[in-house]
């Protein structure tokens, strides 16, 4: 049935996003006590780097603060953000306002009357983006040590061309030695939207315990706080 009333359309989008992003979270691994050592505080130089790395001309999150404001305020913005991030660092908890995001549906090819034919883009606070950029940089140096050499996606300095070269080499060797070779090309529907947070956290915990990840324990706890309490709403 086609929906024509604005309220009905909004309700349908709410139902769709709730189903798409529903979480059955368990094993929250609540930590006792606070970590007060092992990982250095957020530095102002990290904030400056993150601000310079973030793409401009992006829509604001729920707080309505544009990224360009940080560029205008420059050092004053760095000092304010540093004060906020230090508070997050001390409490090891992600701010409640930053746990809320707004989804904007962007139409793709196909029937525009189906919610599944839209790409949902999340609008989050620019201040939270800066903090996430810093946490990502800290975690990335450890993650890169654990990833296998065969993975090229989402890795700096590697890409599709590397994998194409590898595939051609494998095909040539298979032909040379007269061996059968099989390739699987998998396109997951809503791949990023359907990541299992429980499994993601389980993998991260295993890496933390088995490696020298104790040096970023506070980053882990803050990430854990964000992962288990994110809230979203859709704007149709």
What residues fall within each predicted segment?
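Surface-exposed loop/turn segments and immediately adjacent short secondary-structure elements
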Residues: 1-117, 122, 126-130, 147, ...
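Proline-centered turn/helix-capping motifs that create local helix->coil transitions or kinks
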Residues: 25, 93, 139, 143, ...
